[in-house]
Amino acid sequence: MRLTELLSVNRVLVRGRDSRASPSSLSKRDAIDVLAELLGEGAGVPRDEVADVLAEREALQSTGIGDGVAIPHGALANLDKQWAALLIVPEGMEFEAIDGTKVYLLFAVVGPKRATGEHLKTLARISRLLRNKAFRDQLISAESGKAAYDLLVAEETDRQ
């Protein structure tokens, strides 16, 4: 399964460049709330429920994996498939990443509690996709959520 099958153009947001993204300062909790809203809309789950599961996981250990990337994730009993959202913060933000650097790309995933193996494969796919610095830089420079989504589609097509 491709990551772009878990996303939609409506769940990719570039902060400060998309009209839906607030230009004010962004805290870690604010970012989780934005991602939860995007995921909740797609999955048909209340935003607060998604935000709580992402925040609970984040409280265990930061999902900031380094190189400007964070992958907030969690599981919900009432889901029957995985959903993903991408928040791009071009100026970077503090996220308590393991390498101590700012995070620019926040790729969130929620899925069913019973699908642990599938969930782990998705997290690994995201990590592999974002390993390439040139590709990360392209995403960070994207002018809109649609442009970023199109980059993801092209990158996954090239890797097939």
PLM regions and their residue ranges:
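Cytosolic covalent-transfer regions centered on His/Cys nucleophiles
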Residues: 1-160
